């Protein structure tokens, strides 16, 4: 936090990959991180770095805080539903699966213990929940509640978010596609996924590794009035370095897609 403050005071443009300036309410750092922010006045100076949601603000910002990997993957699927007042905002459940690289580059559990797992971690109060709630609440103009439970799975990179929501009103599939297309048709890093059969019926992070894309799809559970919004990304690209470069390009007036418009590394 001190380094960012010092650079900001010198007038430098900053892309921050840490979580230190993602949340705008100082009290949220106590809730989600268990510490008091040393520079609360600077939180309001930071822009949350998702160009698909905040492109114009990022263009003018001096400090952009890149989002958490699971947070950005989930909120890109949920935001159009909140924006169009389609779902119950008190009952949103995010079930996330993430590869081992989501734990960072430091030494950790040995391969023998990590390989082959489907392991829940932080099933309640994961810190990325605060980012999702913050951004969706801003869209809704009211407080949004999100329950998030992440799981470590046996891949190196990739995120799949299964976002369980409950409809406030009846809507058919065609109208849902229209809403998503209206929101993202001009966004080159968002791909809407739905095949009637085969391996590509829904988003799959296997087909995103090495790219800055976020794939979004959905399914309807009419019996339970449930809309399942599905989103996938590469946590090291859209969830980290790719977003940082995309934000830098927007801040600097460069071509937004410079350096990151790569096809996924498939097959791996």
Placement of each model-derived feature along the sequence:
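C-terminal substrate-binding/catalytic lobe of Rossmann-fold NAD(P)-dependent oxidoreductases
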Residues: 90-96, 100-229
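N-terminal Rossmann-like NAD(P) cofactor-binding subdomain of oxidoreductases
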Residues: 1-123, 141, 219-222, 257-258, ...
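C-terminal helical cap and adjacent loop that interface with cofactors, partners, or active-site loops
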Residues: 185, 205-268
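Short glycine/serine/threonine-biased micro-segments
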Residues: 47, 66, 97-100, 156, ...
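Alpha-helical scaffold segments in soluble metabolic enzymes
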Residues: 76, 80, 131-135, 179, ...
